[in-house]
């Protein structure tokens, strides 16, 4: 649901389990049964009325939003293909990707990001420190090298927006500057 933007935080959980549904309803509302009986400490995870109105409106646009994101991502796939210093993920025709972000692995990722930012391109690095190397995970005893693929991704993945407001001109600018950075 990251592609369905509301004006703040929101989310959705679906289940076909009555047991799970009952528990989820309980924990979304402070663990309250009725108004005055708290059977479990929990958070307020309900959408407020304004958020609910925004979500209801946006749900009617989700198909177009998704089509736009897919189109933008596949356009970048096509235009960036062949640049030797980047690795675009292989797409599986049996999987419908909706592209919250467009991501690929890049050699000299940090330098590329700084170059693109200097050209006013919204290039981001998400999750540069893998979860197993975060302070919160120290108690589990993981060390660098335990998850090499994850660590490599943390050091090389860069992302770009492909939301419905990105234009072909914006995408071409990304492509031109990535090619320019790598001298291709």
Place the predicted regions along the sequence by residue.
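Active-site PLP attachment segment
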Residues: 1-23
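PLP-dependent aminotransferase class I/II
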Residues: 16-184
């Amino acid at each position: 649901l990251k592609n369905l933007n509301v004006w703040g935080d929101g989310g959705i959980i679906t289940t076909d389990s009555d047991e799970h549904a009952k528990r989820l309803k309980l924990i979304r509302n402070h663990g309250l049964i009725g108004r005055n009986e708290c059977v479990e400490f929990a958070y307020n995870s309900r959408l407020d009325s304004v958020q609910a109105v925004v979500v209801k409106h946006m749900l009617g646009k989700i198909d177009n939003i998704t089509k736009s994101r897919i189109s933008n991502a596949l356009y970048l796939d096509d235009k960036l293909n062949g640049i030797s210093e980047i690795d675009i993920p292989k797409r599986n025709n049996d999987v419908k990707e909706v592209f919250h972000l467009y991501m690929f692995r890049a050699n000299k990722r940090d330098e590329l990001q700084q170059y693109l930012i200097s050209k006013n391109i919204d290039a981001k690095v998400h999750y540069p420190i893998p979860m197993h190397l975060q302070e919160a995970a120290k108690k589990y005893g993981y060390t660098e090298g335990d998850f090499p693929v994850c660590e490599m991704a943390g050091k090389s993945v860069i992302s770009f927006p492909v939301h419905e407001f990105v234009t072909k001109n914006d995408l071409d600018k990304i492509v031109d500057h990535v090619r320019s950075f790598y001298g291709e």
